[in-house]
Amino acid sequence: NRLCHLQLVTSGLTDAAMFLPDGEVVQPAEALYKRPIILLRGSFDPVMNLHLDMLKQTRTLFQSSLESQQKQETVELCEISMNNLLREGKSGEIDHLAFLDRANALQALGKTVLVSRCPEFHRIATYLSRYTSSPIGIVLSIGLLNELFKEKWSENLAGGILESFGRLFKHEL
């Protein structure tokens, strides 16, 4: 099932595929509807304690600003973008075994996995905001923070980096 849904994302038939910790494929609308979201982007090759520590610290800080009911409903997503998967494969193809290993490792740790076609931060924020009106938190490492300011992510926008940040923060992020 996971490889079939990965192929849907690869083919451009859907923007994202989501896998619950138990391996079940789920529609993002079902899993995210009106729920606060914490998103960690990365390649997760391999999954490291640093990833888990970043999520733990973010969850603590993020949930301190939520109402008690929302704290219980918070969804933690570990997102692997198609850019990461295609970049790491040979000749622009995805290594399906490596993908399954990463997904299995994250799911064994109780994490929900999201595979998306949204390389730009503002696009993933817009995608997630379709499904929730609750707060969305994106966990950034120093490397990703630096990446956020690169022109390549806003070159297709008339307003450049300023428009990119405007789109990113227009949702409750």
Describe the role of every protein-language-model region.
Residues 1-173:
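Nucleotidyltransferase catalytic core that binds NTPs
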